[in-house]
Every structure is written in C-alpha cells, then in structure tokens.
C-alpha cells in the first residue's frame, strides 16, 4: 500500500485506531500550516490581480480530485459559442510539456501541438470543441493575452478557483455530492485545497453527482453553501452515460 492510499484510508475512516489518530494529528498540524500558506498566497495575489479587457468565467472546485470540471467547461464553451460568442479555454496543462512556457493547443481552427505537449485533458477539449481555442500554461495572464489576439471575447478558466492572479466576472464552483467538503479538513488532513470560508467568493455552485446523494444529504450541502455564500446561485447536475465507445486493446 502506498503512503497516499494509506492517508486516503485514514481520511475516510471514522475509527482509525491509536496509530491512525496519531498520524491524523500530525496531518492536522500540517494542514494548519498549509492553510496559512494558502491564505497568505491569496492575499498577495489578490492585491496584484489583473483585470482583463473581456469577461472572465472561472470553473473550479475547493477539493482535490475530480468533480466534473472538464465536462462543465466544455458545456459552457459550447453554449457560449452557439450564442454567437467566441470563448477561449485557458488551462494550466498540469504536468504537460508546455505547463511552464505555455502554448496554443488549438486556435479554434486547427490543432497546433501534440497531445504529449498539450496534456491529455486540454488536447481532449480541443478535439471535442474544435471551434473554440484552447491554451495551456501556468501563467494564464499570458494565455489570456494570446487568446484575445485569436479573437476571444470571453475567457474560461479551467480549474480557476485557486488561480488568483486574474480577476473574474463569474466564479462557478463545483461541489461533489459524494464528498462535498473533503472530510472537513485542508490538505493533507483532508482534501480541501483552501479553507471552507473561501467559498464565500463563489457566484454559482453546481452540485455534481446529484443522483448519487439522498435528498437529505443535498439539503445539508445546500444549507452549508447558503450559510457561506447566501448570494450564490445553487444548481444541480447529474452524471449519466450517453453512449458506448468501442475501444481497441493493445498488448505487448
């Protein structure tokens, strides 16, 4: 068992045992240090955040792991494009070949770089919506400037809730109904990427995997969200298979 798997098991376990409690106590101390660092970073970035000349919409979450951000941003880009807008998706391209230096995956007409350089998700998004530019890079201010030159009139920040260098006009936060608040602790004690109070910045919440949660669970989630951000709109989404795609199996 890996250390990561062991820690995840402890996070989920309501009765971790004596050794587990000691480990969790240590992780809680680290979580406190992590939180202070996150808050300090947010305050510094917030003071210098750039306002772009076109609207910026962020789609993100507050927990580590997948909550459905990619399907959401694809749907949003598709809807905006159908309404006559020219959105562009800005992704960090985590662990991609161009994460540090940045690059254009698609200019809205054709693919410009390989999947290896782009990263799996940005490349998939570029294939899925070929009319929408997709750009990668840690510095999304630079990506935004490139997107505007390509004709974008709306910027979509993929996984943007913790990207504080750019001001946004709409913050959409996805909440996974199966584990909405990351066991109630910040990393590494829990899965929160920043303190719960950060949800006050949100303008819209989308509850994902709603079909997997009881009504009472969703009611509790909504109460917590309303307490933190009474101004925010709360929506629900459902996951369901749309088609089966045949796959080829490769063997060595």
What annotation goes with each model-predicted range?
Residues 43-95, 106-107:
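Walker A (P-loop) phosphate-binding motif
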Residues 59, 175, 237:
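Hydrophobic residues at beta-strand termini and immediately following loops
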Residues 2-54:
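A transmembrane-helix-recognition feature enriched in membrane-embedded lipid enzymes
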Residues 87, 171, 234:
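Hydrophobic anchor at the start of a short beta-strand
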Residues 234-245:
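Beta-strand-loop-alpha "switch" segments that mediate conformational coupling across diverse proteins
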Residues 94-229:
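Phosphate/Mg2+-binding loops and adjacent switch elements
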Residues 54, 85, 132, 154, ...:
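A structural micro-motif
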Residues 250-251:
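Conserved small/polar residues in nucleotide/adenosyl-binding loops
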């Amino acid at each position: 068992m890996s250390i990561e798997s062991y820690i995840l098991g402890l996070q989920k376990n309501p009765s971790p045992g004596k050794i587990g409690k000691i480990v969790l106590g240590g992780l809680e101390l680290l979580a406190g240090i992590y939180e202070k660092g996150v808050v300090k970073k947010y305050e510094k970035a917030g003071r210098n955040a750039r306002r772009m000349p076109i609207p910026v919409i962020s789609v993100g979450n507050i927990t580590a792991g997948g909550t459905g951000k990619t399907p959401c941003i694809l749907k949003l880009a598709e809807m905006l494009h159908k309404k006559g807008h020219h959105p562009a998706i800005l992704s960090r391209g985590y662990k991609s070949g161009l994460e540090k230096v940045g690059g254009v995956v698609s200019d809205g007409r054709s693919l410009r770089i390989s999947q290896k350089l782009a990263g799996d998700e940005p490349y998939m998004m570029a294939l899925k919506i070929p009319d929408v530019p997709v750009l990668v890079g840690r510095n999304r201010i630079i990506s935004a400037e490139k997107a505007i030159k390509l004709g974008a009139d709306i910027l979509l920040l993929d996984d943007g809730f913790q990207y504080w260098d750019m001001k946004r006009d709409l913050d959409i936060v996805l909440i996974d109904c199966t584990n909405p608040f990351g066991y109630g602790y910040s990393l590494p004690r829990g899965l929160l990427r920043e303190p719960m109070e950060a949800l006050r910045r949100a303008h819209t919440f989308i509850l994902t995997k709603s079909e997997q949660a009881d009504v009472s669970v969703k009611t509790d989630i909504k109460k917590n969200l309303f307490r933190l951000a009474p101004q925010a709109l709360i929506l629900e989404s459902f996951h369901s298979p749309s088609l089966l795609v045949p796959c080829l199996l490769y063997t060595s």
